[in-house]
């Protein structure tokens, strides 16, 4: 839904609404600094008006979470989706949300149909009930800059499950989630099933026992639709890889090319914050294509290239540079296009000369493998993911990368010729993990929203209140290891849960 339906609300927060200025800074420079507002217990009340205003005026909202763990990885990849849902529910009931990222994107029609004002928040949370925290999750989060001392000292307290009395008027994370529902904006996530289950259990109500009831509840909670950027990247945009950092950087690069060519492109603006808030603002830098050129002497880490995660972390001797990975993928794709053109030319030549050798005999080299079609390979890769041999990233959804994605990337690599192999060596980075510091719920939410906005732009689709934003991605949630998504719909055999009905009365009875 477009944000301009709230004409009575000022477009940008004012200093009185949480200390945010009306001035904005364009994000069209070579190095874009994305301001992420850190929200903790000591400034939650101060930032509260800005949070509400950002939600109410947003065209869509992207959400991301950092979790204390995920439980048994193998159960999370169960082929039975109902059993998989139960496994995620168990994790949500026993683990907690450590931080919540919100990125509110507001369309600015007066500055162009593809112009957005982005406001990004990173909320540090502390569940007041007992919960499990997994050592691997702690290790992963600490490697990426998560401060557990700050979380325990300044985390915003919350409780899980159903409400305890009337909480609708309090300034709490649970009330904030209710305001997100009241906003009736499209909700955007990345690999969103686990996020949705954790959000429901931690900030909304006790989870329903079956998946059908859960999806029925979601339909009423988010009538403008739920969008999953991992599904959009893998099945709609057809990116070689679909983990978040790859999809974001790919969209950034393509958007930069369109801007340079004078074609329609995304234009972002961010709020300018006063110096008094400098202690609560964390600026994250995004590099435009061509701004960062390193000497390239080491190889690319295959595991990071495929999954966006490497078990060696910062100690990995190979490159985790996303730009190098994308450069290599694009070189492989160009090589495949050249092969295809040669094959078509040879086919036309053979057709014009009856009696000559067949096409199969004329092909120089083995046939290209089919991508994502080998069921045996799929099964093997799923088993590897389940056993933690690949992509077992703790505390994050991104580790559960589909076997299809890995098979795709391996097949692409096998098609590279000698020239492409040389490119792999020559384009490696001396800086092994340049992107590792980016991983945070707030910035991840921003990247998620950016990917969705770009995919919509690339398809020539615009947000409107009367119909789904991207029909092919509307209410489709990515399922690891599956070729079909989870469709969020209300079945004639499923009714919304009682706890959900009570929350709906609370949401709309007091609005």
Curated annotation (Swiss-Prot):
Disordered: region residues: 1-24, 334-410
Compartment list: Nucleus, Nucleolus; Nucleus speckle
Basic and acidic residues composition bias: residue spans: 377-387, 395-410
Biased composition (Polar residues): 350-359
Gene Ontology CC terms, in alphabetical order: Cajal body; cytoplasm; nuclear speck; nucleolus
Membrane recorded as keyword: no
Classification via SUPFAM superfamilies: Ribonuclease H-like
In-chain residues carrying the UniProt-annotated modification Phosphoserine: 5, 349, 429
Superkingdom of the organism of origin: Eukaryota
Sequence motif Nuclear localization signal, residues: 336-348
Signal sequence interval, chain numbering: none
Gene Ontology biological-process annotations: snRNA 3'-end processing
Keyword Acetylation: yes
Its biological purpose: Inhibits cell growth rate and cell cycle. Induces CDKN1A expression as well as TGF-beta expression. Mediates the inhibitory growth effect of EGR1. Involved in the maturation of snRNAs and snRNA 3'-tail processing.
Family classification: Belongs to the CAF1 family.
Name under which the protein is recorded: Target of EGR1 protein 1
Native organism taxonomy: Eukaryota, Metazoa, Chordata, Craniata, Vertebrata
């Amino acid at each position: 839904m477009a944000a301009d339906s709230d004409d009575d609300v000022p477009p940008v927060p004012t200093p009185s609404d949480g200390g945010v200025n009306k001035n904005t800074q364009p994000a069209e420079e070579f190095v874009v600094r994305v301001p992420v507002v850190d929200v903790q217990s000591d400034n939650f009340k101060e930032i509260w008006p800005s949070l509400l205003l950002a939600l109410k005026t947003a065209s869509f909202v992207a959400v991301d979470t950092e979790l204390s763990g995920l439980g048994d990885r193998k159960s999370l990849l169960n082929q039975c989706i109902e059993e998989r849902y139960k496994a995620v529910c168990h994790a949500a009931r026993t683990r907690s949300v450590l931080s919540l990222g919100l990125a509110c994107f507001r369309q600015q029609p007066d500055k162009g149909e593809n112009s957005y004002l982005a406001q990004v928040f990173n909320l540090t949370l502390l569940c007041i009930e007992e919960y499990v925290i997994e050592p691997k999750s702690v290790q992963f989060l600490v490697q990426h800059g998560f401060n557990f001392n700050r979380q325990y000292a300044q985390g915003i307290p919350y409780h899980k499950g159903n409400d305890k009395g009337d909480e609708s008027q309090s300034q709490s994370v649970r009330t904030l989630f209710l305001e997100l529902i009241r906003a009736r904006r499209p909700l955007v996530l990345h690999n969103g099933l686990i996020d949705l289950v954790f959000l429901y259990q931690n900030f909304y109500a006790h989870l329903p026992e079956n998946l059908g009831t859960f999806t029925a509840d979601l339909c009423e909670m988010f009538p403008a639709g739920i969008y999953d950027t991992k599904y959009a990247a893998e099945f709609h945009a057809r990116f070689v890889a679909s983990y978040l950092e790859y999809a974001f950087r790919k969209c950034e690069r393509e958007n930069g090319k369109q801007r340079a060519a004078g074609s329609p492109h995304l234009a972002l603006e961010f709020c300018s914050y006063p110096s008094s808030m400098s202690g609560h603002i964390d600026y994250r830098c995004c590099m435009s294509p061509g701004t960062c050129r390193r000497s390239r002497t080491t190889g690319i880490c295959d595991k990071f290239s495929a999954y966006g995660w490497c078990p060696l972390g910062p100690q990995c001797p190979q490159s985790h540079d996303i730009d190098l990975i994308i450069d290599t993928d694009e070189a492989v794709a160009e090589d495949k296009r050249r092969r295809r053109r040669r094959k078509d030319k040879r086919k036309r030549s053979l057709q014009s000369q009856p009696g000559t050798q067949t096409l199969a005999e004329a092909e120089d080299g083995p046939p290209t493998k089919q991508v994502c079609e080998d069921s045996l390979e799929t099964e093997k890769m799923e088993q590897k993911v389940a056993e933690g041999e690949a992509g077992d990233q703790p505390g994050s959804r991104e580790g559960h990368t589909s076997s299809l994605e890995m098979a795709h990337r391996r097949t692409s690599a096998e098609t590279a010729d000698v020239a492409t192999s040389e490119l792999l060596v020559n384009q490696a980075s001396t800086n092994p993990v340049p992107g590792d510091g980016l991983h945070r719920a707030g910035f991840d939410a921003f990247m998620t929203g950016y990917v969705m906005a770009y995919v919509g732009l690339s398809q020539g689709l615009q947000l409107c209140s009367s119909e789904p934003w991207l029909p092919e991605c509307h209410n489709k949630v990515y399922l690891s290891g599956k070729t079909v998504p989870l469709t969020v719909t209300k079945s004639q055999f499923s009714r919304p849960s009682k706890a959900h009905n009570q929350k709906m009365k609370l949401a709309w009875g007091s609005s």
